[in-house]
Structures are given as structure tokens and as C-alpha cells.
């Protein structure tokens, strides 16, 4: 058994300010990698800039990361970073900016290399330091080595083959407080997917399942808010973010499985948000698991059966998807031996079609 999670995690209120010295110690010139607006609205960008200025650390802002970032975006940021002389990267936002930050850190260290380096398993590139500041409750990317990028050349999403764990993660639930409910819903469903897929996984271990158990208990305690019965509180925001971090710790060991593999086609071809695309396959995936594992997860999440789980996800994060797109997703994952191997039960064509057959769609 191996448990490797080298990220130093600070999880507390105002942690960017409280640990500004640790952030500033990563280098002398930061490339702040984020999306176009959310980090400006939730206050995280201001906190980071203040922290850097307090310690007289220079910074350059790259705020052009799109949802499901592309290799082309990584290369654009790499060129800016190299030209400005940055020596560390801060990813702030959801999974897209943090995943992009990891890939950018690799490419800045290899300024003459082409984008193919990110997917070249024969190479062993170095990278500059990375800090992560998550502002959604789904990615878990702040504690994983994975960077998922869009490959327009092959019309899908793919993980960079090189593992890049952030040096530090600064986790503060306050950045969720003004997020749109839809964003929280979709990312919370993604976190649930990480937790379920890590537990029902060929690579699951006592260490990864320990993280899952903690994460599911926290996630379940937030159901009154997620279902619309309560308003978002600071305590609930903290629990949602921490559940997501536990999910990241779990998939750092196991990786994700079939539902994530199925989701990529829906996101790329159907423009369906990642969390929502992952969520619609969870009940079908869990239904096929060993009875003891299935009952354990249902017990921790407070659902009586997989149908209840599926209905909750469908109400929380509704999706309208055609049968044709679902079938293309099935075909794609059946040609992904790595995702199939991560499933602890035989994931043949019959099983995959059964999983997509149980999808609950809106509209």
C-alpha cells in the first residue's frame, strides 16, 4: 500500500492572509492563473495580490482560463510567464485554473518544448512551484497531481501524463459564499463523484477509503442546503470545500473511474458542465458495485437506494442529453482501457450500456 499526498494544506478562514509568508516563499515572481471573473468577484484574487504585495513579491495576472482549459491556453500562459520571468504559479478558482496552473508550471520549466511534452510519457520534465487556492467545492485538484486538459486535436479531454502536486493549498470556504448556486451544485456533484468512484475502484486502499469516509460524511451533512431547504452558511461552505479536498486526496491514490470517462464526451460534444456530466452516471455505477460497498456508501450519504441517489443528483444538477450522445460516450469509454481497469467489476459493453440506461434527464 502506498499513500502519497505531498501537498501542505491550510484549511481555515482567511488562510491566504494568515499564510502569506508560505505563499511568498515559493518564489520572487508569481504567475496568477485564473478565469475571467469569479476570482475577482469572490475576493480571492484581492487576497492573493495583497499577500504577495505584503512580502514584495512581483506578480503577473493571466485571467484567460476557460472552463475545461485547452493545451493552447496553457501554451499562451507559458509564453507570458517565460517573457515575464515568473518562477512560481498560483492557480486560483475551480478545477480549470488549478489544472491549467499545473500544466503551465511544467511548460515554463521547458520553454523551448512544444505542447506535446504534456502528453509525452517518455519525458520526465521538471516544473516550477505551484500554489492552489480553490474557490469551488468540487475539483479536489488542490491535492492531486492530475491536470485534465482539452485536446481539440482529438476532440476530448485528457490528463497530462506528468504528475504535478501543488506545494501548498490554501482552502477557505468564504470564497464559496457568493458563488452562484448552480456552480456550487455542479461542483458538489463532482466531489461526490470523486468520493464514490474512489471507493468503488480497483486501486482503493484503506488510506483512500479513509478519505472517502470523511468526505462523504461531510458531504451528506450539507444535503439540507443542497436540496434547497436551508441557506448557505459559512459552516456549510467550509464543509463542502473540505469534502471536496478529501475527495481529491482519495482520487490522488485511486484516480477516477467509469463515470468520469463517460463524462468527457458529454462535456466536449454536448457542452455539459463537468460536474453535471459526471453526476448522471453515479447511481448506475454504484448499482453494479458489491452489495457491501454499495450499502456503505448509501448509508454514509443518507440515501435508501441508488434510485434515491440518482433522483437527488438529477434535481440538484439537471442535465438534458440525447441518447445518441450517451451512446457515443459509451463507445468512447469502452475504448479507454485505463478507465475500464479502474472499475472493480467487469465493465464490458453490457454493463456500460446498463449504466447509461439509468440516466435521468431533464426536459
Question: How would you describe each model-predicted region?
Answer:
Residues 298, 302-363:
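C-terminal charged capping/lid subdomain of soluble metabolic enzymes
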Residues 138, 248-273:
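Glycine-rich phosphate/pyrophosphate-binding beta-alpha loops
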Amino acid at each position: 500500500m502506498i499513500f502519497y499526498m505531498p501537498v501542505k494544506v491550510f484549511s481555515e478562514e482567511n488562510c491566504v492572509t494568515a499564510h502569506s509568508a508560505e505563499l511568498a516563499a515559493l518564489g520572487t515572481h508569481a504567475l496568477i492563473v485564473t478565469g475571467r471573473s469569479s476570482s475577482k468577484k469572490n475576493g480571492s484574487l484581492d487576497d492573493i495580490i495583497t499577500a504577495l504585495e505584503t512580502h514584495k513579491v512581483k506578480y503577473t495576472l493571466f485571467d484567460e482560463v476557460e472552463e475545461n482549459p485547452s493545451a493552447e491556453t496553457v501554451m499562451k500562459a507559458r509564453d507570458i510567464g517565460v517573457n515575464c520571468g515568473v518562477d512560481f504559479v498560483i492557480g486560483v478558482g475551480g478545477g480549470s485554473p488549478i489544472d491549467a496552473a499545473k500544466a503551465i508550471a511544467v511548460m515554463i520549466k521547458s520553454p523551448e518544448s512544444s505542447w506535446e511534452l504534456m502528453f509525452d510519457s517518455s519525458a520526465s520534465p521538471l516544473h516550477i512551484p505551484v500554489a492552489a487556492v480553490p474557490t469551488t467545492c468540487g475539483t479536489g485538484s488542490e491535492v492531486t497531481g492530475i491536470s485534465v486538459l482539452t485536446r481539440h486535436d482529438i476532440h476530448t479531454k485528457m490528463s497530462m501524463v506528468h504528475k504535478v502536486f501543488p506545494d501548498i493549498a490554501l482552502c477557505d470556504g468564504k470564497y464559496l459564499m457568493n458563488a452562484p448556486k448552480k456552480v456550487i451544485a455542479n461542483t458538489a456533484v463532482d466531489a461526490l463523484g470523486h468520493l464514490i468512484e474512489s471507493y468503488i475502484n480497483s486501486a482503493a486502499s484503506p488510506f483512500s477509503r479513509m478519505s472517502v469516509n470523511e468526505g462523504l460524511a461531510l458531504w451528506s451533512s450539507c444535503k439540507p442546503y443542497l436540496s434547497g431547504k436551508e441557506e448557505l452558511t459559512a459552516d456549510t461552505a467550509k464543509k463542502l470545500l473540505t469534502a471536496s479536498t478529501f475527495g481529491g486526496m482519495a482520487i490522488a491514490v485511486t484516480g477516477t473511474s467509469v463515470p468520469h470517462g463517460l463524462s468527457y464526451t458529454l462535456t466536449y460534444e454536448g457542452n455539459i458542465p463537468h460536474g453535471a456530466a459526471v453526476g448522471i452516471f453515479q447511481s448506475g455505477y454504484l448499482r453494479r458495485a458489491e452489495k457491501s460497498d454499495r450499502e456503505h456508501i448509501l448509508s454514509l450519504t443518507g440515501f435508501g437506494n441508488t434510485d434515491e441517489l440518482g433522483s437527488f443528483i438529477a434535481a440538484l444538477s439537471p442535465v438534458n442529453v440525447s441518447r445518441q450522445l450517451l451512446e457515443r460516450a459509451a463507445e468512447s469509454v469502452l475504448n479507454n482501457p485505463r478507465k475500464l481497469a479502474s472499475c472493480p467489476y467487469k465493465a464490458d459493453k453490457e454493463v456500460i450500456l446498463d449504466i447509461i440506461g439509468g440516466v435521468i434527464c431533464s426536459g
